[in-house]
């Protein structure tokens, strides 16, 4: 959404000894996104801390500022959900507008100034709700469902960031990494992953276009450079991904983990190797 799979960044043109460059910024047209879930809404905050810190990513910023997020409270959480582990309320997305779909009716509540502005523009399309008890009942039912899910009592171990070296050198990586296929699926479905590559393409005589595209830290050539690859082995790449999620990112972002408990990696990993399994293994390991 704010960090698309592929985006054009620049155009270059060489005429003789003259080089001209054109920056291709996203459209300034307002985009409205309907149905954002609470876990994905939280992921935007995590990405903001990456792309909106100095130096600010102008492409991400432009999309972020021109987008209105309309969240929708969860009514049917997946069995792989564990957003509660990060203090996320699945029934109240952190968006400009919160909505709830109950028995064919859409309940709407503006939260931010941007949400209020959109609500005002909708005018007579919306009407004041006389009774919101149905929303409360749905929220209570959702919480009951969450309380019996397989990961309802799962929590991350708060001591991990304080023991960075021990976590890095743990034997857990040697036990888990061999099962990884390096298929990169987990990184592509994760809403907080943000690795990318930059590619230049010749599109005509003296003309070049630069694109940014998603990449994966699990790929064997992700860190490959002219002088070699600092993470040649699968174990090193596997460890790097989870060290970033569980240790490095929290250390630099007020203790916030780079995970929102959406459960997509649990659903999609072909060998059932995911962040929950890694975190649990580290928690019970004797060398952490």
Residues covered by each model-derived region:
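Ferredoxin-type iron-sulfur electron-transfer modules in oxidoreductases and energy-metabolism complexes
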Residues: 156-178, 196-288
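Iron-sulfur-associated redox domains of electron-transfer enzymes in respiratory
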Residues: 1-163
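Short alpha-helical basic/polar micro-motif
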Residues: 37, 184, 188, 267
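Hydrophobic positions within alpha-helical membrane elements
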Residues: 42-43, 189, 268-269
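Basic (Lys/Arg-enriched) interaction patch that binds polyanionic ligands
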Residues: 178-198
